[in-house]
A protein has these predicted regions:
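Conserved AMP-binding/adenylation subdomain of ANL enzymes
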Residues: 144-174, 181-245
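ATP-dependent adenylate-forming carboxylate-activation enzymes
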Residues: 11, 32-33, 50-68, 80-83, ...
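Gly/Ser/Thr-rich phosphate-binding loop
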Residues: 219-223, 232-294
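Conserved AMP-binding A3 loop
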Residues: 1-3, 121-149
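Structural core segment of the AMP-binding/adenylate-forming
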Residues: 43, 47-106, 110-114
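Conserved AMP-binding/adenylate-forming
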Residues: 13-59, 177-178
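Conserved pre-ATP/AMP-binding loop-to-beta segment of ANL
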Residues: 107-125, 131-132, 158-174
Length: 306
């Protein structure tokens, strides 16, 4: 529950403050597959005054060595799994490694607002597809610029649900998070879904996609092209039951075929697309137009719309 979540976040605040001297602005790396503790440590580090560094644990050691060398983490909370270079990480940062649940025995802290609107809050590395990976600096101000849009979009989701699924009276929606939490599209869900008090269903491995989806009913899902195509095939082939109620796939339409999106919309899926770079939290513009003519439209000012 959110009550338990907040208590654990308070414990994490205590843990980080007790284990990182002069913590303000110090870096806390998070290197783990998706799990509950990822959210706890993210909020805990930020509320303690530290800077969260999300780490793609599946990068090569030279890539990780470069990135960690740039940020100089004071601690790295991690899941202990060897993704291919565990011995290198232990040799270089063994004294800074902590388990993801290191906070569990700490006393809950009183929360104090110590984060300035323009203070560095998160460092998120790019994929490195255009050269060496770069750390994008996110503050509270630019990180939460899109939250109002996200909350309004939540209202649009409810409007759609009430119109198309009036028999379902549960307005506590849930989001299936299968994309990794080091990716902005999933990381931001830790924050924006909490604004509504809605649920985030975390899945750690794409190989368990259908199993986890079957265990956790979800309304929305952030998708990469492979997942959107899988959803499309399930709908087309009469296997929609496998999706356990998913009705709002969200992606970036630049990646998807417009005809496929339109057909999914005709089959009762609410298609959402977001546009933007990491600096705008991936949601500089949100398009939830379901009309075939505009479902794949890249966002433009209102006076450009037909």
């Amino acid at each position: 529950t959110y009550a338990q979540y907040v208590q654990d976040i308070r414990r994490a605040v205590t843990y980080f403050k007790e284990n990182i001297p002069d913590i303000k602005g110090k870096r806390v790396g998070i290197m783990s597959r998706n799990c509950y503790e990822y959210g706890v440590n993210s909020f805990g580090a930020i509320l303690a005054g530290a800077v969260v560094v999300t780490i793609n644990q599946k990068k090569t050691w030279p890539e990780l060595e470069y990135e960690l060398g740039l940020v100089e983490p004071s601690l790295i909370v991690n899941d202990g799994i060897d993704y291919g270079c565990r011995p290198d990480i232990e040799a270089a940062y063994g004294d800074k490694l902590r388990p993801m649940d290191a906070f569990k025995d700490s006393a809950p802290a009183e929360l104090v607002d110590c984060v300035g609107h323009d203070d560095l809050m998160v460092l998120m590395f790019t994929s490195g597809t255009t050269g060496r990976s770069k750390a994008v600096m996110l503050s509270e101000r630019n990180f939460f610029t899109t939250v109002e849009c996200q909350v309004k979009f939540g209202d649009a989701m409810l409007d759609y649900k009430h119109e198309h699924m009036p028999e379902d009276k549960n307005d506590v929606l849930s989001n299936f998070a299968i994309l990794p939490l080091f990716h902005l599209g999933t990381f931001i869900c830790l924050f924006v879904w909490a604004c509504k008090g809605w649920a985030l269903n975390l899945s750690a491995d794409i190989r368990d996609f259908y199993r986890d989806l079957g265990l956790m009913h979800s309304d929305a899902i952030a998708v990469a092209p492979m997942l959107m195509e899988a959803i499309y095939k399930d709908v087309k082939r009469g296997r929609r039951a496998r999706l356990n109620g998913i009705w709002n796939p969200c992606g970036s339409s630049a990646m998807f075929d417009g005809a496929m999106l339109a057909e999914l919309a005709q089959q009762g899926m609410m298609i959402t697309q977001v546009y933007g770079m990491t600096e705008t939290c991936g949601d500089g513009i949100i398009n939830y137009e379901q009309d075939e003519k505009h479902i794949r439209a890249v966002g433009k000012p209102d006076d450009h719309a037909e």
